[in-house]
Regions:
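Flexible, solvent-exposed coil segments and beta strand-coil junctions
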Residues: 1, 38-50, 98-107, 150-156, ...
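Gram-negative outer-membrane beta-barrel transporters
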Residues: 80-90, 94, 106-195
Length: 201
């Protein structure tokens, strides 16, 4: 099938040091079993086959974002701050059903289309550079991911709107110090909050 996925961007610079941007994009994921599904099952010590439902359709997305990118210099220091808000609407979301034994000892999970979903959040990023000696960069994303209708991923837990294995908070940090060339000292790290498994939505 031919799928039309338009994209559009609009940028406005009210001053030389401020960039404002509006973006729209659409996309899709083809109906298939993904490597990450098998990886998740193997981590749990169990291998389950992923089968596609006969009427499985592609998962589609429409995304909107607005951002402000600000630059400023304080003497020998250069700074940059970015704030971006985003909203994504998903339709025909891929979901995996409860595993069942197909009769030959092999566990099978059925991939089907679930309810729609929404992801909304904000990203903050900052950069600081001092001459050519030091550069520091950090970012933080706060988001909320929810199904439009409660979804039950296991018979032992109640149906909930929370999308499983999606973080609400994640971020990163990098720093590079160059005291003398060619010596470079770097430090970096990432943060991801605990992923939802069984708490209330």
């Amino acid at each position: 099938n031919v799928i039309f996925s338009p994209r559009a961007n609009l940028r406005f610079n009210p001053t030389q040091n401020i960039n404002l941007r509006l973006s729209y994009s659409s996309g899709f994921r083809a109906p298939q079993a993904f490597d990450e599904d098998m990886h998740i099952e193997n981590v749990g010590g169990t291998v389950a086959m992923i089968e596609r439902a006969k009427n499985l359709k592609e998962e589609k997305s429409q995304s909107f974002s607005a951002s402000a990118d600000i630059y400023h210099r304080f003497g020998a220091f250069q700074t940059n701050f970015l704030i971006e808000g985003f909203y994504t609407k998903l339709t025909d979301v891929f979901v995996l059903g409860e595993p069942y034994n197909r009769g030959d000892g092999v566990l099978v999970k059925l991939r089907s289309n679930g309810p729609g979903a929404k992801v909304v959040g904000v990203t903050l990023e900052g950069k600081l550079a001092y001459l050519s000696l030091l550069q520091v960069q950090a970012g933080l994303t706060l988001q909320r991911s929810r199904y439009d209708e409660p979804h039950k991923w296991h018979d032992d837990v109640p149906a909930k709107r929370t999308i499983f294995r999606t973080p609400n908070v994640y971020g990163y940090f990098t720093a590079t110090y160059i005291p003398i060339k060619p010596l470079s000292i770097a430090l970096s790290g990432t943060y991801t909050c605990l992923l939802y498994t069984s708490d209330a939505a």
